[in-house]
Each structure stands twice: as structure tokens, then as C-alpha cells.
């Protein structure tokens, strides 16, 4: 965006390893001011995407091999579909269960096909997703669109699966003073990050591939920074 001889670039939510949706690379762009995704901020020890996926799939595979169902609390949009593609690719025989929000999002992929990578569209269109059973626990992976476990129905499901030896894996930010954080701090859940945003290191790497006079690192409400980097 340019006005009065000055230009602004806004990345929006951006991660250059996006799995499901097509994206344009942020390279070779000139702007006086750039607002770049830095939602994960100065997170320490952030592994590469490949390492993150390997760790997550290994944890899921190990739990299933032990007869333990896995529940993945994810946001309503984005991250869950990406994780599902890796399960389909690496653990193709796994039964998948999901709440209505996740199933609805999956159903919308046909309507948004122009934004979805063709290979992902083909992979997910052939995957049968079951509704979460209410009267028994089956072995498989459960997607629930409730990342902080705010819904009482989600918490009841988690309790039911934990009683049966299930494993809860969070893959994104666990916000403080939530039911998710209580479960994590009690040692009844695990955090294995699956990145969908940039860390500060990612943001600076992307900035180095462009020509921005000034950068504002855009963060979430839980890690607010207004620091401006001069480059």
C-alpha cells in the first residue's frame, strides 16, 4: 500500500512453511514501513517445522501403539487441518474423530479450493472423519476446536479419555489461567508446538529477504511488543 510517496507492507498472519493454504513468498519487496507477523515473539528453543512435525507424529504414534487415544485441542481454523495432513500422510490407517466445528471447516475446503494446495485437497477429500462418540471411547485421534478447553463438553471428553489412558497434546500457545494451562501444569497434558506463525527469528529472517526501512513486529495480546526494528 502506498500513499504520498510512502509505502506500507502488512504481512497478515503469515508463516512461510504453511501446509494447507497456498501463499505468496515475501521476498524482494520494498517498503518504508513493514508490519510483520511475529506472534510467537522471542520464544526460546523453537525447533524447525520438520523437527516439530516429527516429534508430534512420534508422540501420536507411540500413544496409539500403546492403545491410548490422543486428543488434540486446536483453534477453529488453520492449525488442525495442517496437523491432519501429516497424520494422513504418515499414519494413514489412523481413525480420526472430530467435533462439529472441525468437520464443518473440513467441509468448507471445496468452497475455498482456490486457496488450498491441490495435493492437500486430494489428500483430505478422501479421509473419512467420524463424529466423536458419546457413549464409548475408541482408539484414534480426536480433534476438538477448543484450544484452551473453555467448553464444558470438551473438558468432559478430556476427562473421559484420560480415564481410559488417553493422551492430551497441545500444539499452540496455552494461555495463562485457563483450563488448558491447569491441565498442562498438572502434568496431564503435553505441549508439542506446531508453528503457524513467526517467531522473532523467523520475522527477522523474512525481513532480511526484503528492503524495509522500518519494521513493526506484530504480536498477540499475550506477548505484546511495540518494538520497532531499524534495518
Go through the PLM ranges and name each one.
Residues 1-23, 65, 133-135, 139-141, ...:
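Core dinuclear metal-dependent hydrolase active-site scaffold
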Residues 1-95, 119-120:
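His/Asp/Glu-rich metal-coordinating catalytic cores
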Residues 178-202:
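Generic long, charged, amphipathic alpha-helical segments
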Residues 56-171, 176, 208-211, 218:
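Hard-cation-handling environments
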Residues 6-10, 33, 141, 167, ...:
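Structural motif
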Residues 19-21, 44-45, 105-111, 178-180:
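Short, charged, surface-exposed secondary-structure boundary motifs
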Residues 204-207, 212-214, 219-231:
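Generic C-terminus detector
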Residues 47-54, 78, 148-149, 193-201:
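Conserved phosphate-coordination/catalytic loops
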Amino acid at each position: 500500500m502506498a500513499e504520498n510517496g510512502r509505502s506500507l507492507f502488512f504481512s497478515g498472519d503469515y508463516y512461510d512453511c504453511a501446509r494447507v493454504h497456498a501463499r505468496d513468498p515475501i521476498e524482494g519487496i520494498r517498503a518504508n514501513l513493514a508490519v510483520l507477523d511475529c506472534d510467537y515473539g522471542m520464544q526460546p528453543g523453537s525447533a524447525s517445522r520438520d523437527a516439530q512435525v516429527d516429534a508430534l507424529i512420534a508422540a501420536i504414534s507411540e500413544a496409539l501403539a500403546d492403545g491410548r487415544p490422543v486428543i488434540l485441542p486446536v483453534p477453529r481454523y488453520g492449525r488442525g487441518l495442517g496437523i491432519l495432513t501429516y497424520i494422513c500422510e504418515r499414519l494413514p490407517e489412523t481413525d480420526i474423530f472430530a467435533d462439529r466445528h472441525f468437520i464443518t471447516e473440513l467441509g468448507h475446503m471445496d468452497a475455498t479450493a482456490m486457496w488450498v494446495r491441490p495435493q492437500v485437497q486430494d489428500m483430505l477429500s478422501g479421509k473419512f472423519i467420524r463424529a466423536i462418540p458419546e457413549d464409548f471411547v475408541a482408539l484414534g485421534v480426536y480433534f476438538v476446536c477448543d484450544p484452551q478447553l473453555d467448553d464444558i463438553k470438551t473438558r468432559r471428553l478430556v476427562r473421559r479419555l484420560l480415564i481410559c489412558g488417553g493422551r492430551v497434546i497441545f500444539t499452540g500457545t496455552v494461555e495463562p489461567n485457563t483450563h488448558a494451562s491447569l491441565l498442562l501444569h498438572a502434568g496431564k497434558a503435553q505441549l508439542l508446538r506446531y508453528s503457524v506463525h513467526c517467531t522473532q527469528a523467523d520475522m527477522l529472517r523474512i525481513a532480511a529477504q526484503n528492503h524495509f526501512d522500518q519494521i513493526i513486529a506484530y504480536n498477540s495480546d499475550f506477548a505484546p511488543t511495540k518494538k520497532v526494528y531499524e534495518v
